[in-house]
């Protein structure tokens, strides 16, 4: 497994790409309201990426994906395709997943939005999913096994009564959208990967309110929970530092510091 170690110049470019991706999620928030279509949200994001940020949407055309962002509602786990016929409604939980390319480097991030008045379950699932991401990020430092992080996320999520999707995971990122290693959010063989300074990857747990099993729709992209239960996901791109990590896609609404250090 060839895991690339980024140079300081690479990391600086990834800070820029990561900041741009985060800014898309900050920009779109006021538009998330009952009645808006996911197609309209996609166009707003694309216009902002192309015309304001002078960047590229990594999703558009990736393996034939037809839109600029992924918008996944309620029981949709990931890769929901924006559609002018799909209107948001009160109580929906919505994930928007954005990946921006700037100067050849990628920034990848997603967050949950709650439309109008939240349901108790929807709000709790979103909160626990974000907390599981933060838990994983706070563990990142040189010398730790990736498997340790996945096991901790799984234990926390299941302790809260939720399940962790198995088929999708975090990934290395840089010049490539998806690089080595795979970052699993549950306890499984990680190929012995030990973190080193300069590694860049995403952590992006997907938690279901019901069973962890999923199914892919006929469009070949949209993934839903098999039991139709709600699903939530949060994602950040991070870099391993000499004594911890730095979040490259931090937003103003995040409640975790950008730089996390361990003083052992």
Swiss-Prot record:
Cofactor(s) listed: Co(2+); Zn(2+); Mn(2+); Fe(2+)
Top class in the EC scheme: hydrolase
Binding locations of substrate: 79, 178
Keyword terms, alphabetized: Aminopeptidase, Hydrolase, Metal-binding, Protease
Reaction catalysis annotation: Release of N-terminal amino acids, preferentially methionine, from peptides and arylamides
EC number(s) reported in the record: 3.4.11.18
Residues the record lists as binding a divalent metal cation 1: 97, 108, 235
One biological process term in Gene Ontology: proteolysis
Pfam families: Peptidase_M24 (PF00557)
Molecular function GO labels: initiator methionyl aminopeptidase activity; metal ion binding; metalloaminopeptidase activity
Lineage: superkingdom: Bacteria
Gene Ontology cellular component list: cytosol
Binding site for a divalent metal cation 2: 108, 171, 204, 235
Co-factor binding comment: Binds 2 divalent metal cations per subunit. Has a high-affinity and a low affinity metal-binding site. The true nature of the physiological cofactor is under debate. The enzyme is active with cobalt, zinc, manganese or divalent iron ions. Most likely, methionine aminopeptidases function as mononuclear Fe(2+)-metalloproteases under physiological conditions, and the catalytically relevant metal-binding site has been assigned to the histidine-containing high-affinity site.
Family designation: Belongs to the peptidase M24A family. Methionine aminopeptidase type 1 subfamily.
Assembly, per entry: Monomer.
Function (record text): Removes the N-terminal methionine from nascent proteins. The N-terminal methionine is often cleaved when the second residue in the primary sequence is small and uncharged (Met-Ala-, Cys, Gly, Pro, Ser, Thr, or Val). Requires deformylation of the N(alpha)-formylated initiator methionine before it can be hydrolyzed.
Protein name, per record: Methionine aminopeptidase
